[in-house]
């Protein structure tokens, strides 16, 4: 029987044996600028983990424009649908992505297994689960009464 610890060790060995290329993602598409930075292990500067494409002013402007365009539809998306995105991500992180997140945190931030589990996996899963709950609570508290001449409300974007 393979234990969770064995799977975590396998993922750590797999990721530490790779050098990956990280593009920018703008409007859902990979962008490779050719302006490359290097990501090394903080505890072993000779061990390269990744080469990443750095954004310049044109890429930053494209990302801003893309974000503003995405906001138009996202802000009109029902609260439950938006919550479902975070809840699905939390489920994936709590399950099949957990070892990948923990291993990458250990390698890129010099955390031990316990620190990675608490600081990366547990906290992020909690945030992705708590925030939809609290958003719904805020949504439910929209005032029913407003004094004459005013209208109290919350707009959830």
Name what the model sees in each region:
Residues 34-38, 102, 150:
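Short glycine-rich loop/turn motifs
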Residues 11, 131-134, 149:
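Generic alpha-helical secondary structure signal
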Residues 137-157:
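Conserved small-residue-rich beta-alpha loop and adjacent elements
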Residues 1-49:
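Hydrophobic face of amphipathic alpha-helices that form TPR/SEL1-like repeat modules
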Residues 40, 45-139:
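Glycine-rich loop-to-alpha-helix module at the N-terminal edge of alpha/beta enzyme cores
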Residues 29-30, 86-89, 122, 144-151:
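A glycine-rich phosphate-binding loop feature that marks nucleotide/adenosyl-phosphate handling sites
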